[in-house]
Amino acid sequence: YYFRICFLDNFQAQVLVNFAKEKFSAQKAYCLGELGNEYDQGLIAFFEQNFDGEVIKDSFPTNTSDFTTYLNKAVAEDVDVIFCPVSIAYATQIVGLAASMGLDIPLLGSDTLDSNVVLEAAQGSNVQLYVSTFYQEGGSPEFDDGIKAWLNEDSTAMTNNGGNDTIAAVTAMGYDAYYVALEALKAAGSTDKAAVKAALPDVTYTGVSGSIAFDEQGDAIRDT
C-alpha cells in the first residue's frame, strides 16, 4: 500500500495540455521520453490522450548524451510545443542544448523538471521552459524564510539545492509529507504500523503546498 501527497501524472499532463492550448494555441506537439521509462512514457501517453491535435513521439535510449537529432526533428516538423517529461540529468542536457541552438519552441516539462539544476541550465538564454509544479516560492513566506535561512547556513544543503536558495517544490512536498505522517501518528496514538496505516485515510492536513486528503487508494485529494 502507499499514500502519496503529490498530484497524479494524468492530472499533470492534462494541465500541461490545457496550458499549451491556451497560451500557444498549440495544434502540433513533439513528445520526447526515455525508452522503457514508465514515468516518461506514461506522461506522454496521458498527454497524447488529452491533446486533440497532432502528436509526434520519439524515445531515446538510456544514457543518451546528444539530443541534437531529436531537437532538430522538432524544428523540422514545425511543432508548436515540445513535451519532455524526463529525468533531471536528461532535462539539463536538453535545456542546455536548446539554449545553445537558440531554440524558440516552448519546452514543457513535468514535475521532474521543476529542479533548480534544470532551471539554472536555462538561465541567461531565451529558452522558453514551462514546468508543472507542486509549490511556487511565495506560497508560504514563513516556510520560504525558514528554508532559505537553513540553506544559507549549510553549504552542503545549498549545493544539493542547485547552488542557490530558490525553494524547490520537492522541499515543500517533503515538508508536508512529514507533517501528514505526524498527523497520522497522532491520530493512531501509536507508532504501530498497522495503526498508522488505518489512520492515514482519514488524515486531512493543510500544508505549505495546499490542502491534502486521501482517497480510498491512497492517492491525494487536492484542492489547489
Regions found by a protein language model. Give the residues of each.
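Second-shell loop/turn segments in exported
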Residues: Y1-F7, G33-G36, Y130-E137, G163-A169, ...
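An alpha-beta-alpha
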Residues: Y2-T62, V81
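Solvent-exposed loop/turn segments at secondary-structure junctions
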Residues: F7-F11, L35-Y39, F60-S65, S87-T92, ...
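Structural motif
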Residues: Q12-V15, S59-A76, P141-F143
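Sec-exported extracytoplasmic/periplasmic mature domains
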Residues: N18-S25, E48-D52, N72-V79, G96-L103, ...
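Extracellular/periplasmic periplasmic-binding protein-like sensory domains
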Residues: G53, V95-Y175
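Segments of small-molecule ligand-sensing domains
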Residues: S155-A172, L182-T224
